Amino acid sequence: MIGIEPKYIIIHHSLTKHGKVVDWNAIRDYHMKEQGWKDIGYHYGIERIGEKYAILTGRAENETGAHTSQNKMNFQSLGICMVGNFDLTRPPEPAFKLLVDLCIGLCRKYDIPVENIKAHRDYASYKTCPGKMFPMAELGEEVRKRV
């Protein structure tokens, strides 16, 4: 489906079911080669590239994602994947700041309420995604200050 109107932002981390952290390109390869999808399932990613963190692009914002099938959220949300395992540690501050900025921009662009920034685990309760140590409440607070 082309032309979604996002009402939610869903935050993920890149921890696999086998306990490994994979990078953006490995996720894209898996989604395209193993799953047979046309692109990575997320709309954006945040990963360390060299000495700095960067926002990486995935699917176009108006394309249906493949990141949260529960409650048909793929059809009404943008998916952002933070590369890392946040069951063990908080995201690095520079990566978290990029996520805050990205969420602010998307909330403004699509008039998404801050309370609609959700963790993947909110829909897939059998997961911890985006991690036990991921500061979802802090993310909401930081975005709310600047939206």
Task: Mark where each language-model region is.
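Hydrophobic alpha-helix position signal
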Residues: 31-32, 107
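Basic/polar, cationic surfaces and motifs that engage anionic cell-wall
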Residues: 1-14, 18, 46-64, 68-147
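Aromatic-lined glycan-binding groove of carbohydrate-active enzymes
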Residues: 35
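Short Gly/aromatic-enriched secondary-structure transition segments
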Residues: 24-31
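Glycine- and aromatic-enriched membrane insertion/assembly motifs of diderm outer-membrane
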Residues: 38-45
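Substrate-binding surface in catalytic domains of secreted glycosidases
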Residues: 21
